[in-house]
C-alpha cells in the first residue's frame, strides 16, 4: 500500500515529494502472498528519488515462504528406525492443494531432500545409452523402492542435471533407469555437457532423491503428496517444541519491470532482506543446463559440424533462465545497498534485460541454490546459444552496471553448475571488490556465446575481487572465467586462492585460477595474485594481453582485494567448509624415462591430461625427461610405466636445493616468462660423500651466501636440484630468450666464493652412465612433442 500511496503522490505531483519519497520498513517478517511489483509509475527522479529502506537498526524481511507447524513424533515404521525418531506434520496447502517445494530449512539451516547416498558420498553410473535414453546404475540397496516423484541428480562435466525418474528396472545388483520427457530426450541428445564414462577418473557421479524409502539420515526430509504429510529426520539437538521449519512458496519476491520506452528509474532499496524463494521448474520439466545454470530447452548434435559463425561447432542449444528472488527488467539508476539475499532456491538477484547504470553495493548473498547475481541476456529462448548477440535496439543490453563490495558465500548449493556472479552479453560493467567463497563451481563468469565474433560485449572490468574456496563440486572451473570477444575488457588486481578438491570431478586436474575460454578476445589480464600459474587459454581469439599473474605481484594487491569499508562487517558472514579438502598446489617435479623407441604422441597425450604447468619435454641420448609443476607425480609415473613397459621410469620430487630469485635477491621481481635448462649427473658412490653434498646444500644459504648472490647476479630465476638415488637433476631457469652461456659467467664475476663452491662440488659429482670420460653434467635438449 505504501508503494501505491507513493505512486499517487507522483501522479498528482504533490509538492511534499520534491526531495524524494522514503518508504520505511519496520523490524519484522513480512510474509508475501504475491511478489512486490515495482513499475515505471513508481519511478523517482534524480532530484526526487524513491527510497525503500529499513528503519534504523531494524531488519525487515520479505519472506516468500510458509512456516510448517504441528510437528509430532511419527510412531510408524521407517527403515527399522525406533518409533518417534522421525517427525511428521501436515503439509501446508494453498487453495486446497499441497504446496510443492524442493527445499526445506530447519532453524535457518537447509535440510536434505531424502537421497540414496550417505552424507556427501555419491555413486557412479555404470553406463548411459543415448539411443534408449536409459542409464544403468549400481543398485545394491534393495530397501530403495521406486515411487513417482523420484529423481536422479547427476554430475556431468561442468554442470549437473535433475532428471525425473519414469521407472527403475532392477536386475541383480544393477538397475536400468528411465526418465520422463522432456528432459529424457534433451539429456540423451545434447552432446555437451553429458554423462561421462572414464576408467581413470570414474564415471559420472550421481544419487537418487525424493523418495520415502531413502529417508534414513538426520537432516533428511520427504514430502508425501499422496497422504499430505511431510516427514523430517531431525538433527542432533533440534527440539520438536521450538523448531522453526520453513518451506519456500513464491518463486519471485520482488519484480521491478519497465520497458524500453518507459523504464523504472531512480529507486533505492536499502537494508531489506529477501528470504525463502522457491523454484519448481525442475519438478515440472527436469533441469538439464548448458552452463551457468541456463537450462536447455532443446539441444542436439549436428550431423555435419559447422555454422556460419563457427566452422567447428558440433552442437546446437537453446536455453532458458532460472527464476530469481529479485528480478529486474528495463530499469536504470537503481541501487541495492546493504540488503540480504538468503535461503533461496535459485538465483538471488537478476538484472535480466534492458538495465543500465544500476548499483549493487554492500549486500549479503548467502545460502543460495543458484547464482547470486545474474546480469544481462545470455541467450533469449528463441536465440541459439552460440551466436553473438547484437540486438537492433541496444536498449535491450545491460550496461554500465556496478557490482561492488558484496559478500557472496555458500551459493550454487542446489544447481552446482551455477556461479557467484554471472554476466552474459553485457557492456561497460564493473565487478569490483567483492568477496566470493564456498561456491560449487566458478567465482565470476563473464561472457556468453563461445565465439570470437563481434557482439555487444565490450569495456567490462573485473577488478580487486577476493575469490576463494570455490570448485567445491565441479571442475573445468576457475576463479574468473570468460567467453567470447570483449574489446577493452580487463581482469586486473584480483586475489584468487584456495580451491576446493572435488571428489566427483570428471578431470581432477582441470581446476584453474584464471580461464579465458572459447573465443575470449581483447582482454587485459594483469597483476592478479594467484598462488601458482594454473591458468588456461582455451581456443582464444586475438588481442589478449597477459602480464604478471602470479604469487610475485605486489603484496598490496592481495591486501586491497575484497570488501572495503563501510561494508567490511560482511566478512563476519563468510562461509568456509572446513570439512572439505583443498587442492594441493602443484609442485615442480621431474619424471625420467630411460629407454628407446618412445611413442611421443601417446606420451604427450597422457601427460597433457595431467594439466602440468609450464610442462616441457627434454632428451639426452636414451633419457626422456618431463618437467613442470604437477600434481599426482606418482600416478603419472605409474601411468607412464604402463604406457612404456620397456622403459625405466623414475620420479624426482622435493628438491634438495631450491633457489628462487624472488625470495633471495633484494628488490627483485621475477621475469614474466622463463626458459628452463635441465642437466643431470650422479653423486659419487661413497655414501659419506653423498651425505656431505646434501649437508652443504642444506646450509649453503647460511654458510655460502655468495653462491646465491652469484645466481642473483646472473639473473637466474630459479635453480633447483632434485635427487633420486645417486642421480641428480639440475634445473636452471632464466628469463625467456636469455642465453645461459652468457648469464652463467656472471655467477663467478668478482665472486671468488662461487669458484670455491664449484671446485668443492666436483668431488661429489660424476657422470651418469653413457657420459664421456671426465664428463659430469650433461644437458638435455628441449623437444617439441608435436
Whereabouts are the PLM-identified features?
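Extracellular beta-strand solenoid repeats
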Residues: 24, 31, 37, 51-53, ...
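Short glycine/acidic-rich loop motifs that flank beta-strands on beta-rich extracellular proteins
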Residues: 34-35, 251, 278-284, 323, ...
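Right-handed parallel beta-helix
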Residues: 265-276, 312, 332-343, 355-370, ...
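Short glycine-/aliphatic-rich beta-strand segments at the starts of folded cytosolic domains
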Residues: 579-596, 675-692
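An amphipathic, aromatic/His-enriched active-site/gating alpha helix that lines ligand/cofactor pockets
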Residues: 611-616, 629-656, 714, 734-777
Amino acid at each position: 500500500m505504501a508503494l501505491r500511496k507513493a505512486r499517487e503522490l507522483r501522479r498528482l505531483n504533490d509538492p511534499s515529494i520534491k526531495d524524494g519519497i522514503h518508504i520505511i520498513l519496520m523490524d519484522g517478517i513480512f510474509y508475501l502472498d504475491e511478489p512486490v511489483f515495482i513499475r515505471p509509475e513508481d519511478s523517482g527522479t534524480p532530484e526526487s528519488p524513491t527510497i525503500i529502506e529499513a528503519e534504523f537498526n531494524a531488519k525487515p524481511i520479505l519472506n516468500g515462504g510458509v512456516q510448517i507447524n504441528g510437528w509430532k513424533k511419527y510412531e510408524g515404521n521407517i527403515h527399522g528406525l525406533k518409533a518417534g525418531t522421525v517427525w511428521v506434520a501436515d503439509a501446508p496447502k494453498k487453495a486446497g492443494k499441497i504446496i510443492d517445494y524442493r527445499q526445506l530449512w530447519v532453524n535457518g539451516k537447509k535440510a536434505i531432500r531424502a537421497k540414496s547416498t550417505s552424507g556427501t558420498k555419491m555413486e557412479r553410473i555404470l553406463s548411459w545409452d543415448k539411443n534408449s535414453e536409459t542409464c544403468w546404475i549400481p543398485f545394491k540397496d534393495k530397501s530403495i523402492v521406486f515411487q513417482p516423484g523420484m529423481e536422479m541428480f547427476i554430475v556431468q562435466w561442468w554442470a549437473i542435471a535433475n532428471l525425473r525418474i519414469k521407472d527403475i528396472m532392477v536386475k541383480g545388483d544393477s538397475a536400468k533407469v528411465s526418465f520422463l520427457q522432456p528432459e529424457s530426450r534433451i539429456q540423451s541428445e545434447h552432446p555437451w555437457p553429458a554423462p561421462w564414462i572414464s576408467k581413470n577418473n570414474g564415471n559420472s557421479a550421481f544419487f537418487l532423491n525424493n523418495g520415502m524409502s531413502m529417508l534414513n539420515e538426520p537432516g533428511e526430509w520427504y514430502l508425501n503428496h499422496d497422504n499430505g504429510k511431510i516427514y523430517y529426520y531431525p538433527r542432533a539437538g533440534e527440539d520438536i517444541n521450538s523448531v522453526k521449519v520453513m518451506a519456500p512458496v513464491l518463486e519471485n519476491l520482488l519484480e521491478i519491470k519497465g520497458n524500453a520506452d518507459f523504464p523504472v528509474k531512480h529507486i533505492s532499496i536499502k537494508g531489506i532482506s529477501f528470504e525463502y524463494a522457491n523454484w519448481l521448474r525442475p519438478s515440472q520439466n527436469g533441469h538439464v543446463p548448458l552452463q551457468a545454470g541456463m537450462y536447455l530447452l532443446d539441444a542436439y548434435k549436428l550431423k555435419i559440424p559447422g555454422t556460419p559463425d563457427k566452422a567447428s561447432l558440433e552442437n546446437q542449444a537453446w536455453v532458458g533462465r532460472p527464476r530469481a528472488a529479485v528480478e529486474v527488467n528495463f530499469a536504470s539508476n537503481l541501487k541495492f545497498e546493504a540488503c540480504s539475499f538468503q535461503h533461496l532456491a535459485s538465483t538471488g538477484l537478476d538484472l535480466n534485460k534492458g538495465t543500465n547504470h544500476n548499483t549493487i553495493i554492500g549486500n549479503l548473498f548467502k545460502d543460495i541454490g543458484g547464482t547470486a547475481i545474474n546480469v544481462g541476456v545470455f541467450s533469449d529462448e528463441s536465440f541459439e546459444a552460440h551466436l553473438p548477440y547484437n540486438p537492433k535496439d541496444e536498449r535491450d543490453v545491460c550496461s554500465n552496471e556496478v557490482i561492488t563490495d558484496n559478500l557472496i558465500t555458500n551459493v550454487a548449493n542446489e544447481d552446482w553448475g551455477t556461479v557467484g556472479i554471472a554476466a552474459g552479453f553485457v557492456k561497460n560493467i564493473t565487478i569490483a571488490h567483492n568477496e566470493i567463497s564456498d561456491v560449487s563451481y566458478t567465482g565470476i563468469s563473464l561472457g556468453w556465446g563461445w565465439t570470437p565474433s563481434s557482439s555487444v560485449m565490450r569495456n567490462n572490468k573485473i577488478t580487486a575481487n577476493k575469490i576463494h574456496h570455490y570448485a567445491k563440486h565441479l571442475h573445468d572451473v576457475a576463479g574468473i572465467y570468460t567467453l567470447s570477444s570483449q574489446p577493452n575488457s580487463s581482469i586486473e588486481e584480483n586475489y584468487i586462492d584456495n580451491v576446493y578438491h572435488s571428489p566427483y570431478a570428471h578431470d581432477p586436474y582441470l581446476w584453474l585460477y584464471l580461464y579465458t575460454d572459447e573465443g575470449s578476445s581483447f582482454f587485459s589480464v594483469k597483476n592478479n595474485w594467484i598462488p601458482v600459474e594454473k591458468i588456461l587459454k582455451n581456443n582464444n581469439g586475438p588481442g589478449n594481453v597477459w602480464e604478471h599473474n602470479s604469487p610475485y605481484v605486489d603484496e598490496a594487491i592481495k591486501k586491497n582485494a575484497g570488501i572495503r569499508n563501510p561494508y567490511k562487517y560482511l566478512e563476519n558472514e563468510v562461509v568456509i567448509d572446513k570439512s572439505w579438502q583443498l587442492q594441493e598446489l602443484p609442485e615442480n617435479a621431474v619424471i625420467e624415462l630411460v629407454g628407446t623407441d618412445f611413442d611421443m604422441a601417446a606420451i604427450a597425450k597422457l601427460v597433457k591430461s595431467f594439466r602440468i604447468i609450464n610442462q616441457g619435454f627434454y632428451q639426452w641420448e636414451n633419457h626422456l625427461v618431463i618437467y613442470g609443476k604437477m600434481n599426482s607425480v606418482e600416478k603419472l609415473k605409474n601411468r607412464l610405466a604402463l604406457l612404456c613397459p620397456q622403459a625405466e621410469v623414475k620420479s624426482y620430487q622435493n628438491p634438495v636445493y631450491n633457489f628462487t630469485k624472488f625470495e633471495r635477491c633484494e628488490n627483485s621481481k621475477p621475469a614474466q616468462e622463463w626458459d628452463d635448462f635441465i642437466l643431470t649427473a650422479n653423486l659419487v658412490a661413497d655414501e659419506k660423500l653423498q651425505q656431505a653434498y646434501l649437508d652443504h646444500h642444506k646450509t649453503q644459504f647460511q654458510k655460502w651466501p655468495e653462491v646465491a648472490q652469484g645466481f642473483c647476479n646472473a639473473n637466474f630465476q630459479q635453480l633447483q636440484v632434485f635427487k633420486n638415488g645417486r642421480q641428480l637433476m639440475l634445473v636452471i631457469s632464466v628469463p625467456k630468450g636469455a642465453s645461459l652461456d652468457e648469464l652463467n659467467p656472471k655467477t663467478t664475476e668478482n665472486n671468488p666464493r662461487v669458484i670455491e663452491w664449484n671446485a668443492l662440488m666436483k668431488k661429489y659429482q660424476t657422470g651418469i652412465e653413457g657420459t664421456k670420460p671426465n664428463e659430469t653434467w650433461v644437458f638435455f635438449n628441449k623437444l617439441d612433442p608435436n
